[in-house]
């Protein structure tokens, strides 16, 4: 896809009508994807969570989520459909989460990312996330380590 696709990009709060498209993105993006049922529960019933989706021509082509835990946020997932990667959608989703975290007065954001996922790690670093630790054998599909990344926010 070309970067001209971003002209039609909208980042909105995820709603029930986006779940089917998001489930497709989830299944194409993760080795152990969340089920449609888990996605529905998160989007509709988790009062401590906020989810955004990236829409192009009304179709959800990416999504991102964050849980609020006290005064911190934990980024749960960021995923973009393979046909729409590398054109800035992931960055737009990170920006939406950062803006939301700041509007809630959160002091920090954290996330886990596969040690091998250099593309995602470089996006997070671009936005000021730093390596803060490691979870050994965190991912059950291949026992890969997770890098814990943190970003302190201005309050």
Question: What positions do the PLM features span?
Answer:
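Conserved hydrophobic beta-strand within the GNAT/NAT acetyltransferase core sheet
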Residues: 75, 109-113
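Conserved catalytic-core motifs of GNAT/GCN5-like acyltransferases
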Residues: 112, 125, 130-146
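Acetyl-CoA-dependent GNAT
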Residues: 4-5, 13-83, 87, 94-96, ...
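Short amphipathic helical patch at the helix-1/turn junction of helix-turn-helix
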Residues: 80, 114-115
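Short glycine/proline-centered loop/turn elements that form peptide/ligand docking sites
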Residues: 94, 116-120, 137-142
């Amino acid at each position: 896809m070309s970067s001209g696709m971003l002209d039609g990009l909208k980042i909105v709060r995820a709603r029930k009508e986006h779940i089917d498209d998001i489930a497709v993105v989830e299944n194409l993006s993760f080795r152990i994807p969340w089920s449609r049922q888990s996605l529905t529960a998160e989007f509709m019933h988790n009062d401590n969570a906020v989810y955004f989706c990236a829409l192009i021509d009304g179709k959800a082509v990416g999504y991102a989520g964050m849980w609020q835990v006290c005064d911190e946020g934990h980024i749960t997932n960021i995923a973009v459909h393979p046909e729409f990667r590398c054109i800035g959608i992931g960055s737009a989703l990170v920006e939406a989460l950062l803006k939301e975290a700041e509007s809630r007065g959160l002091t920090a954001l954290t996330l886990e990312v596969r040690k091998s996922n250099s593309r995602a790690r470089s996006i997070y670093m671009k936005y000021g996330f730093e390596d803060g630790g490691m979870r050994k054998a965190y991912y059950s599909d291949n026992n890969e380590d997770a890098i814990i990344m943190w970003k302190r926010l201005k309050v």
